[in-house]
């Protein structure tokens, strides 16, 4: 797997989280499998490659890849505006987080507790989702930049949905951190658009 593919998998994770946030905000629905994959990505330690962070299967990131392709193609018909806004906001928040060692320490200290909960209850249990959402609230929500989520207030006001959205934003920012650690940079989205698209088209065509 090339470094560019690894970067695109991580960036696909950012966009996957963004798509799921948008879906929950607008419809109150997202599959447990998709949510579980993103929550699981928070807890993976020492993966053999980037894909293993997301369950070892590109299919888990298909919706994220599609949203990323839509953003890079700049086609108004395929552009998913809210997921793109969330994804770019997560990339920005990750850069702020990187300057805050205290918040990184808090996240590092509390993830093992969430891991224990997940082992006991299961990844998508409401306790695990609530703990992950609370970790986002106690750390990333304290930064100057905030992510404003737009959607149907009937769904946004439900505590479980709010926790899911925060937990997914935390997972998306973890993916953004991974992307940057792999050498990803926002300028690539502007100046290497065609190269990224060609690689993404190949990844979408491949069986895995």
Swiss-Prot record:
Membrane-topology descriptor: Peripheral membrane protein
Keyword list, A-Z: Cell inner membrane, Cell membrane, Cytoplasm, Membrane
Superkingdom assignment: Bacteria
Pfam families named among the record's database cross-references: DUF489 (PF04356)
GO CC terms, sorted: cytoplasm; plasma membrane
Family annotation (InterPro entries): HflD (IPR007451), HflD-like_sf (IPR035932)
Keyword Cytoplasm recorded: yes
Keyword Cell inner membrane: yes
Subcellular location, record wording: Cytoplasm; Cell inner membrane
NCBIfam families membership: PRK00218.1-2, PRK00218.1-3
Stored PANTHER family: HIGH FREQUENCY LYSOGENIZATION PROTEIN HFLD (PTHR38100:SF1)
Family: Belongs to the HflD family.
Name listed for the protein in its UniProt record: High frequency lysogenization protein HflD homolog
Organism of origin: Pseudomonas putida (strain ATCC 47054 / DSM 6125 / CFBP 8728 / NCIMB 11950 / KT2440)
Gene name per UniProt: hflD
């Amino acid at each position: 797997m090339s470094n560019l593919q690894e970067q695109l998998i991580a960036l696909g994770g950012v966009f996957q989280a963004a798509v799921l946030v948008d879906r929950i905000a607008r419809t109150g629905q997202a599959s447990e499998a998709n949510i579980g994959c993103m929550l699981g990505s928070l807890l993976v330690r020492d993966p053999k490659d980037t894909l293993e962070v997301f369950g070892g299967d590109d299919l888990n990131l298909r919706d994220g890849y599609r949203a990323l392709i839509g953003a890079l193609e700049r086609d108004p018909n395929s552009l998913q505006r809210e997921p793109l806004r969330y994804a770019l906001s997560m990339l920005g928040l990750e850069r702020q987080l990187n300057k805050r060692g205290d918040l990184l320490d808090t996240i590092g200290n509390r993830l093992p507790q969430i891991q224990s909960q997940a082992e006991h209850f299961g990844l998508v249990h409401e306790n695990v989702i609530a703990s992950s959402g609370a970790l986002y609230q106690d750390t990333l929500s304290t930064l100057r930049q905030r992510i404003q989520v737009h959607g149907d207030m009937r769904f946004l006001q439900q505590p479980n949905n709010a926790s899911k959205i925060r937990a997914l934003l935390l997972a998306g920012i973890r993916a953004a951190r991974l992307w940057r650690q792999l050498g990803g940079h926002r300028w690539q989205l502007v100046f290497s658009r065609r190269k990224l698209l060609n690689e993404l088209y190949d990844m979408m065509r491949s069986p895995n």
